[in-house]
Design a protein with these regions (language model features):
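Surface-exposed amphipathic alpha-helical tracts and adjacent flexible/coil segments at the periphery
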Residues: 72-84, 89-96, 100-112, 124-127, ...
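Well-ordered mid-protein domain cores that form the structural environment of catalytic cofactors
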Residues: 153-189
Length: 488
């Protein structure tokens, strides 16, 4: 009986969606399968060579079942990319099932002034954390680049290569060219507004993954995907271009995000990472000659609702989208956790053939609990006009309220000790615990103890003990996740 085979080690190369990578791996590696401590096949009699790949599939079928292997192979074909603006969000993304994360460091990224940003030193730590967890790391270098930026651009990309970042995301030819010249993989940003096959053919010389314009509908995306496979249109890696598209989060009112409102109003360019969210304000529309205010549907005439695609995710994947990008580098870990977890479950459900309305309804509920401005389908299903939010700020059905910090964690019994610093904690409260290493832990309190005695609540100034489902750490912050009233 075969007793010493690791199924995941076998699955990794054999279930790769990339034929070239599969062939290279099999040609390069020996495969030893052992029985009862005795070599069944070793250095002198390798069972699996390039010419006997089919035998490997028989072994996989024996070990884990053909359906599971095919499911894992298919899952490797799809990627959920999560936004990261803090270490809390990074760990939340990883723990929720993200396949990759994208982030920026100081300067030359589209959130350099409007969201949390990491330093060059953080770059090495983030890349190491991602490698440790088997998650790809993408660095955004996606602003307009001027001549005076070129030296900084090269330093950033050099640091990305040195740190082992998986790829950069670019929207300007300068970083594309430089990254390729030093062997750094490039993904192309939605800022390029790629809407047709001719543009894709041109940009294929730079990148293996391309974000198509979010103004396209799914029929147009499917046509581009067919062209990629039929020609085929190959990236620098020699494989067909992979299509990436935004799946969830805030949308810009301008075409592919090329907005000039901030520059016009405040002298700060959104295309240089300094968006001041001018579009999110309420406005009155008046006739300049008469002073009469014109009646419009709502005051937020330039603030789009957020994109949500989970209810037609199957159509996106069927159309050829392979990388699902989630917007939200300025959002907290609770947002990242909820959105990544929902889309992870949705993709897995699609692959398992269990994607249905009941599950969509449950995912919708969880997505509505965290930051959003209301939802719409974007332009993906053929809608030509945008949908605008009716209120300022978030329409989330829940809000987090800070109440305590973590003092200790007792790993043997799975209990945390917490100092209540504001308000109170009650049995039945849903709470969030966040920290740079912890990421986010979300659960409902079943029991509280103060000085070993069970109580219904712990108030400001008290130290309490609560059973927690995952490890937490000293200094982690504790929030109540409670219902909120949404403006109508």
């Amino acid at each position: 009986m075969i007793t010493q085979v690791t199924p995941r080690a076998l699955l990794a190369p054999l279930c790769s969606p990339v034929g070239g990578a599969l062939e290279g791996f099999v040609k390069e590696h020996s495969w030893g399968i052992f029985t009862e401590g005795e070599a069944f096949a070793g250095a002198e009699g390798r069972l699996l060579k390039w010419g006997t790949l089919a035998f490997g599939w028989l072994i996989l079928h024996y070990l884990c079942g053909l359906n599971e292997c095919l499911s894992l192979m298919n899952r490797n074909e799809y990627e959920i990319m999560a936004p990261v603006g803090s270490y809390e969000s990074l760990m939340a993304a990883i723990n929720a099932g993200a396949d990759s994360v994208y982030f920026g460091i100081e300067g030359l990224n589209m959130r350099s002034k409007s969201a949390n940003n990491f330093t060059t030193e953080d770059l090495y730590r983030i890349a190491a954390i991602c490698r440790e967890h088997g998650v790809k790391s993408y660095l955004t270098v996606n602003t307009i680049i001027y001549d005076e930026d070129l030296e900084l651009m090269r330093r950033i990309i050099d640091a990305a290569k040195d740190a082992g970042v998986s790829s950069i995301i670019a929207a300007d030819v300068a970083p594309m060219l430089y990254a390729r010249s030093i062997g750094v993989e490039v993904h192309l940003s939605t800022q390029l507004n790629i809407t047709n096959v001719e543009a894709l053919r041109f940009y294929a010389q730079f990148a293996d993954v391309v974000v198509l314009a979010r103004e396209l509908n799914m029929d147009q995306v499917a046509a581009i995907h067919r062209a990629i496979l039929e020609e085929p249109i190959l990236g620098p890696g020699g494989q067909p271009i992979r299509i990436e598209m935004f799946a969830h989060g805030a949308l810009c009112m301008a075409v592919s995000g090329k907005c000039y409102l901030s520059l016009h109003e405040h002298g700060k360019s959104a295309n240089r990472g300094s968006c001041s969210q001018v579009c999110r304000r309420s406005y009155e529309v008046r006739d300049k000659e008469t002073g009469i205010e014109l009646e419009v549907d709502n005051e937020y005439i330039m603030s789009p609702k957020d994109l949500k695609t989970i209810h037609f995710l199957n159509k996106m994947l069927d159309s050829g989208v392979r990388v699902l990008k989630i917007e939200g580098r300025a959002r907290g870990p609770e947002y990242v956790d909820a959105v990544v977890r929902a889309y992870r479950e949705a993709v897995d459900s699609y692959l398992a053939g269990t994607f249905d309305e009941a599950r969509v309804e449950q995912w919708d509920k969880h997505l509505g609990e965290v930051f959003n401005r209301g939802f719409w389908d974007g332009y993906y299903l053929g809608q030509r006009l945008g949908e605008w939010t009716s209120s300022y700020g978030s329409s989330a059905t829940k809000q987090k309220v800070y109440v305590a910090k973590t003092n200790k964690y007792f790993s043997k019994i799975g209990v945390g000790e917490f100092a209540v610093e504001s308000g109170e904690l009650r049995v039945g409260d849903e709470i969030l615990i966040t920290g740079q290493t912890t990421g986010l832990v979300r659960f409902t309190i079943e029991e509280i103890r103060v000085e070993m005695d069970p109580v219904e609540r712990a108030v400001k100034g008290q130290v309490c003990s609560i059973a927690v489902p995952e490890k937490v750490r000293p200094g982690d912050r504790v929030y109540i996740f409670t219902d909120r009233k949404v403006a109508q």
